[in-house]
Regions:
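Conserved acyl-donor/pantetheine-binding loop and adjacent beta-alpha core of acyl/acetyltransferases
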Residues: 76-111
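Conserved active-site alpha-helix within GNAT-family acetyltransferase domains
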Residues: 136-155
Length: 186
């Protein structure tokens, strides 16, 4: 089976949203009920990724080694700075002085195995310093992140504002994210 990763296009939107819906179902079935609530990620968010040239789709072949153009995954791969990464709590980044890329909104169909590996291969072929975060309840993503050699660095909060406000919102379990970083040498 072969895959290609390419920049997402506006004409991909319906397929991307189907992948997002499938990913949400996987999350809910695995006990992750608080991440990616109703309406997120929206077409507006995906369009913003595309406008930054940071929205990507994963296409898979049809089993006969012919690319079918079937979109089986989506992710955002964006250059620093990431505003929510400016403050990290209960830890620190491996390095906070070098530019990095961030990976957000990884989604795939449940029967498309190895998507995370394909995405990481793509990302590390473009940059050597990558950060990623996920919800505390997203055990599947945490497993994949650690399996691919990322280091847990601490906690970040999605909303801006002072730390006390962020921490009180986080007690509801919706804004807190576990943050990871991996650096490789070329």
């Amino acid at each position: 089976m072969s895959r290609i990763i390419r920049e997402a296009q506006p004409s991909d939107m319906a397929d991307i949203m189907q992948v997002m819906d499938a990913a949400k179902r996987i999350m809910r079935q695995s006990g992750n009920i608080r991440q990616w609530g109703e309406g997120y990620p929206s077409e507006v968010v995906i369009t913003a990724d595309m406008e930054k040239n940071g929205g990507f789709v994963v296409e898979e072949d049809d089993g006969e080694h012919q690319l079918s153009g079937k979109i089986v995954g989506y992710f955002a791969f964006l250059p620093s700075p990431e505003p929510t990464y400016a403050k990290i709590y209960e830890g620190k980044w491996i390095t906070d002085t070098q530019p990095y890329y961030v990976v957000h909104r990884i989604a795939s169909y449940p029967n498309s195995h190895g998507i995370f590996s394909s995405i990481m291969d793509f990302c590390f072929s473009h940059d050597t310093n990558i950060r990623i975060d996920t919800h505390r309840d997203n055990k599947i993503m945490q497993h994949n992140i650690l399996k691919h050699g990322f280091t847990y660095c601490g906690i970040i909060y999605l909303l801006s504002g002072d730390a006390l406000d962020q921490r009180s919102l986080a007690t509801k379990g919706t804004q807190e994210r576990l943050a990871y970083q991996k650096m490789v040498s070329r």
